[in-house]
Amino acid sequence: MLERLNFIENKYEELSIKISDPTIIADQKKWQKLCKEHAELEEIVMKYREYKEALQDLEDNKEMLREETDKDMREMEQEEIKRLGDIIEKREDELKILLLPKDPNDDKNVFVEIRGGAGGEEAALFAANLTRMYTRYAEIKGWKVETISLSATDIGGFKEIVFMVKGKDAYSRLKYESGTHRVQRVPDTESSGRIHTSTATVAVLPEVDDVDIVVNQNDIRIDVFRASGHGGQCVNTTDSAVRITHLPTGLVVSCQDEKSQLKNKEKAMKVLKSRLYEKAQEERNASIAEDRKNQVGTGDRSERIRTYNYPQGRVTDHRIGMTLYKLDSFLNGDIDEIIDALITEDQAQKMKSIGSR
């Protein structure tokens, strides 16, 4: 581990010199690339330097303890040695996590797809609740949300919605939301007060670069139609909405958010590329934990990653067995506590996997 950390520190120092070089600054594209590399290494280098400093302080204090004869001073030195030992142990754990292989998609923007599953109209209303939850979470994080396509019901539910989230670390945090979400509550339309169980499926896809996936124009069919609003009413008098069908796979993507047909086509192509990229990833390794195919399933009630229980004010994530009794704030975007716990569990599993090799 130390050999690798020394290499990273040397690389960081080399980059520090390069990004201050006027000849490199003149080439903005190259300079920005080097600045990005430099920023990515900064956290681990700072932690490593703190770790080395604590090691040196520990050795100095041990030396002082060996030479000290005063009882009170020896007790103080022993307390300091224990404190430094705790710091070193903590820094070692932090460095191990920072050295874990990074998901290449973590710094990308994302497409979020939410569909009502089992439960009919109530499932569509729950899909709308989840959409609001992620929209509020994005606002808290300072991310930007753009609707790509929406199929709404007459009473405000969402049969299906696709939206894009743009911002720092969007995929690294939202990727854990892929799966089937279950809600238990008394619907507004239920006169007997019976609790109903419904589901909605969430899929989180990273935005892909043009170099990541190439779409042959001969493999797609593009249809245009008039955009519709809530309940299906027409909201546009021109054929601005776009539907793209990828003929080899049968994947279909629609976009009607923009008034411009060209902009809708561009957005739909981005979603299509992300879906094709995800499909290629699934075929390359069917066991990848983040695959939507494995996580989302069919939307059946028996498949779930999280339950939202309204009568108890409870949200439970079944992957880590974590329960929070703050449903209202959770649905209002306060979801970091569970996401942080999922990230910690993911990191622990990766460390365990590396340690068993």
Swiss-Prot record:
Q: Which keywords belong to this entry? A: Cytoplasm, Methylation, Protein biosynthesis
Tell me the residues on which N5-methylglutamine occurs: Q233
Keyword RNA-binding: yes or no? no
Q: Name one Pfam family in it.
A: RF-1
Biased composition range(s): Basic and acidic residues: 283-306
Q: Decide whether keyword Protein biosynthesis is in the record.
A: yes
PROSITE patterns found in the cross-reference section? RF_PROK_I (PS00745)
Name the family the entry cites.
Belongs to the prokaryotic/mitochondrial release factor family.
Entry-linked PANTHER family: LD18447P
Any idea what this protein is called? Answer: Peptide chain release factor 1
